[in-house]
């Protein structure tokens, strides 16, 4: 259950958040919202640790940010948020990721943007294999499965954030073809 910090009431995780109608692709319950907030907060903290570590020359922060980025990429590897060509049909799905990773212009946008920035700040501290893990299982997968659409059809958020996220991810992946996308 979740306790609201404002009204102090306790809510079951499956309670409809009431933000979007059930027919909206962003519709979700309170559990979805809390998990999405976790992803957004974690990736933001990774960027902050990496940036502060660089600015202050603090290897502890750089090491921790690298560790978290690699852990995140490893977890993303086995996380089926959309049916994909690479996923076995019998692979279990986690109910929350159906709506969390449809937040194209909100949650994913921020998550991918932060992952790409963190990767840029930490790339030189990783082995070739570690870089490949982050590139393939975190950045490229979110980009392919969630962000790429031929036409932006949503009115929930600003299109510039969608574009800047694709460009940031393209820079992290060193893909000039995506910058001109």
Model-predicted regions and their roles:
Residues 1-56, 62:
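N-terminal carbohydrate-binding/catalytic regions of secreted carbohydrate-active enzymes
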Residues 35-181:
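Aromatic-lined, polymer-binding surfaces characteristic
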């Amino acid at each position: 259950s979740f306790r609201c910090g404002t009204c102090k009431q306790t809510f079951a995780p499956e309670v409809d958040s009431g933000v979007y109608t059930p027919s909206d692709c962003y519709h979700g319950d309170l559990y979805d919202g809390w998990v999405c907030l976790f992803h957004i907060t974690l990736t933001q903290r990774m960027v902050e640790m990496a940036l502060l570590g660089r600015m202050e020359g603090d290897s502890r922060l750089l090491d921790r940010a690298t560790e978290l980025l690699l852990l995140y990429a490893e977890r993303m590897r086995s996380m089926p948020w959309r049916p994909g060509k690479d996923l076995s049909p019998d692979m279990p799905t986690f109910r929350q990721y159906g709506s969390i990773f449809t937040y194209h212009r909100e949650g994913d946008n921020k998550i991918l943007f932060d992952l790409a920035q963190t990767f840029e700040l930490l790339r030189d501290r990783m082995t070739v294999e570690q870089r490949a893990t982050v590139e393939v299982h975190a950045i490229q997968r979110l980009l392919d499965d969630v962000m790429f659409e031929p036409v932006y059809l949503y009115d929930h958020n600003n299109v510039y954030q969608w574009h800047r996220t694709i460009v940031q991810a393209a820079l992290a992946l060193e893909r000039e073809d995506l910058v001109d996308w």
